[in-house]
Amino acid sequence: MKRSANPETRAPADARADRPLVLVPADNRMLGEHPFHVAGKKYVDAVRLAGCLPLVVPSAGADEVDELLSHADGVLLTGSASNVNPRLFGQEVNDPSLPLDPVRDTWTLPLARRALELGVPLFAICRGFQETNVALGGTLFQAIHELPDKDSHRSAP
């Protein structure tokens, strides 16, 4: 079923026979010698527990964002072990060991911007909030845990 990306013409989820569809962008990881698209189970489970249908989306082109959003009732930008590339907010990479996911950066920043423009609900966690901030022109501290009185909040996968 094709849904309208325009919130004014998109039928509400309760008017359809299906659950709300939430896009969950995947991370890009190497498992051994092979590239994979992955999403944390805790995020997929949380979407289901909220009564929605999660759809893990592999990397997409910026030209596919509107089409994806036309099918979605919401977007969940998840946390990740990777960071938004500092070059995307006008800084050089301070630490070459910084885990980056340039493929995710390429399409989740336009996805966040467009979802907000269209009024598609967007929920962001950790890296996802950083993506949203950068997509809207904000900047980040590359190593916030190194600032006084700041701790790393990373949890086990």
Model-identified regions with their sequence ranges:
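Conserved G/P- and acidic residue-centered "switch" motifs that form tight phosphate/ATP-binding loops
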Residues: 126
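The feature captures the ABC ATPase H-loop/switch
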Residues: 129
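N-terminal beta1-alpha1 cap of cysteine-dependent amidohydrolase-like domains
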Residues: 1-123, 133-141, 145-157
